Amino acid sequence: MLPSQAPEATKLIVGTRSAWLAARLTVEFNNQSWVVYGYTDASKLGESRKFAAMTLKDRRQHQRDAAKKLLPGLKGALDIAAGRIQAFLAVADAEGLLHLAGDLSEHLADGVNLVHLPDILESALASLRVEKARETMGTAIRQAVRLEDYPESFRAHTRKRRLIAVLGPTNSGKTYDAFKRLAKAESGVYLGPLRLLALEAFNRLNDEFKVPTSLLTGEDRRDVARSKVTASTIEMLNPDRQVDVAVIDEIQMLLDPDRGWAWTQAVVGANASEVWLLGALSAEAAVRALASRLGLELEVHYKERKHPLTVAQNALAGDPIAALRQARKGDAWVVFSRRNALTLRDDFLARGMSVACVYGMLSPEVREREAQRFADGDADILVATDAIGMGLNLPIQRVVFTAVTKFNGEEVQRLEVPMLQQIGGRAGRYGHQPSSKGKQAKDGIVVGLTPDEHRVVVELMQAQQTPLPARGFLIAPSQAYLERLSKLASTERLEALLAAYEQHADQGDGFFRAHVPQEMLDRASMLDAMQNLTLQTKHLLAMVPLSSQHEVLGATWTDWVRKVNRDVPVGLEFLRGHPENAALDKAEMAVQQLWAYLWLSYRLPDSFPMAEDARELLEPWVEAVDLHLRGHARQGAARTAGKAAWYRPAPVRRRF
């Protein structure tokens, strides 16, 4: 249809500096009306401040007067504009772009200088073509990456499998039952969330259960002759290896926002006749949903605590200084930062008590040594962060919460029920709690430091854990997915491919959900700036276990990436000084850097060729950390007489 070229109305357009009279033009195309308010330099009415001071009545009168004078002159410009818009719409329609042109339609209706209309339409057409290409690409990606087909990408999909869920609180014997089953299996694998747990499984299966077991983590590999079982971190799952029994620990981490994808992958892809799922009762609904979706037989076994757990009737003391005097052998005092752990340790040492200390920055080897000192009675008190929530079977008689809030990376939040209950459940660990001959061992006890903390401890220890959702299981972008997307998009830019995966993968009914780990996203842009890295290498470097948030460790990662890009072998020059002279924080960083170097040496051996040297240097640096923690030198914040620098009062909920 031909456009309507007659102006039907006028509009006063007031900009930041000037004001114009615009005339309305309606263009009819394919039964749709495109409304344009157009003006020219000739229809300028003056400075905008003049109109800002007018009343609405005066504005309207001025608009009517201007229309009588200026509309005839605008008609020619409107006629030309109508033809240009008609031509634009015809091209956009032929290329299937009109459904994307909503923003342009609004822009034209708001008012446009007709002198600039050709440039506006040309730019809009180019933008619409880009948007159409993205839309087409999104459709292709949805067809190529269908998350509901995820299970079919694993060999396990073709074999008969049975899920056995063993659910219960801490100290209920779940792991012991699973280890007994692994001991009887012809072949098996243990998959845990931490290198510490894999190491514990490795040691227990070899020493306690007499099962030849190898260790396989991202950083550490120990082959044992004639091994039947492999103890591994969960990300190291080998879905192509067939085994009789696979044990997946801490199954309640299925919906963890950072690492839940690894549990989804393990449940879906573990190539075993029996897949044991160990974890909290809150995971039951999620486990049942997965079993149903995968069409697998499921057995659920419920476990009870082997040793009683009691929440103390009262807080430990009225204030933190008085609470220190109530500390006793067998206590575990819980804090939520490295600084507070070391400062509290210092205060106990000043009172003449021996202390073991465990926190997240420590390597598994040091944590295990510190835990052993406590277990052997060489340390009276254990000071720990939430790092003791998983693993580390210890003879803890009482767990003391010095805080009930934790900084989550963005803000300070109150502890969630599962975390507090899991840490509290470390008290009275089965098989470790000492008892006298013929007498029952004492209950494990959980207590808050002061009344403020204790009120929260009582509330959360009595609370029911919220069941995990039965859908929304995370799937991270595998190398195979990224290569598929790269071919479709004709690019190896990691950032673009990760965004395309998260935005366009076909998520079906939402049972499975596309997820890109934040650390990977944060690193992608810099990796794309490196000209010589393949997509596979960029993907691998994005997963290096070094925190980008830590200034020194982040700088180490950046330096390594640049050297790999230049094809320069990475040496051990990142190590500064000697372990025997290093401060605690320097020694901790050196251990983390060495483990990350070993992680990369398994994957990029040509770029990280000094693995043997790194392994030899690791022990002296681990020993340096251990010596600091076993020593009596102050490691935390400066001490202030009469004050507990490690204590922050719990927020009080006021009642109105």
Task: Describe the function of each predicted region.
Residues M1-V145, A476-F656:
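Non-catalytic terminal extensions of ATP-dependent helicases
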Residues D177-L182, D258, A262, G269, ...:
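Conserved interdomain hinge at the start of the Helicase C-terminal
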Residues S187-A201, W276-L278, E284, R325-R351, ...:
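Conserved strand-helix element at the start of the C-terminal RecA-like helicase core
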Residues L205-V243:
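Inter-Walker segment of RecA-like/P-loop motor cores
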Residues S214-V224, T343, S354-T385:
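Conserved helicase ATPase core of P-loop NTP-dependent helicases/translocases
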Residues E219, S227, E284-A327:
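Interdomain hinge/linker at the junction between the two RecA-like core domains of SF2 helicases
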Residues Q252-H307:
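Post-DEXD/H (motif II) to motif III coupling segment of the RecA-like Helicase ATP-binding lobe
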Residues E274-A283, L394, R398-Q462:
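Conserved segment of the helicase C-terminal RecA-like domain
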